[in-house]
């Protein structure tokens, strides 16, 4: 089962990096992203610090607020492909 734990930690790290990167690309503060998404600012911060286990519905909300897709939030290549 250790492999599953490592994979899970990788996904949390990728999500954290991508949420922060897409937020910056969209010139949004955590407060602005919170307002757009309906999530609390501290929740956004905890996602970016890899402290949250995000639900599928929250992933969808974040993807819409960041003008991207759930798969792009969960892959290292998602952001690179969009930047060209």
From Swiss-Prot:
SUPFAM superfamilies (alphabetical): lambda repressor-like DNA-binding domains
Single GO molecular function: DNA binding
Transmembrane segments: none
Source organism: Serratia marcescens
PROSITE patterns: HTH_CROC1
Name this polypeptide is given: Control protein C.SmaI
Gene3D superfamilies in the record: lambda repressor-like DNA-binding domains
DNA-binding region extent: 30-49
InterPro entries named in the record: Bact_TransReg_Diox, Cro/C1-type_HTH, Lambda_DNA-bd_dom_sf
Domain HTH cro/C1-type residues, every copy: 19-73
């Amino acid at each position: 089962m250790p492999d599953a734990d490592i994979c899970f930690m990788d996904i949390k790290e990728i999500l954290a990096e991508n949420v922060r990167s897409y937020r910056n690309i969209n010139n949004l503060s955590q407060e602005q992203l919170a307002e757009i998404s309906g999530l609390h600012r501290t929740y956004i911060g905890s996602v970016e610090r890899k402290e949250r286990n995000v639900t599928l519905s929250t992933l969808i909300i974040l993807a819409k607020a960041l003008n991207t897709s759930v798969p792009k939030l969960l892959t290292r290549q998602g952001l690179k492909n969009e930047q060209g």
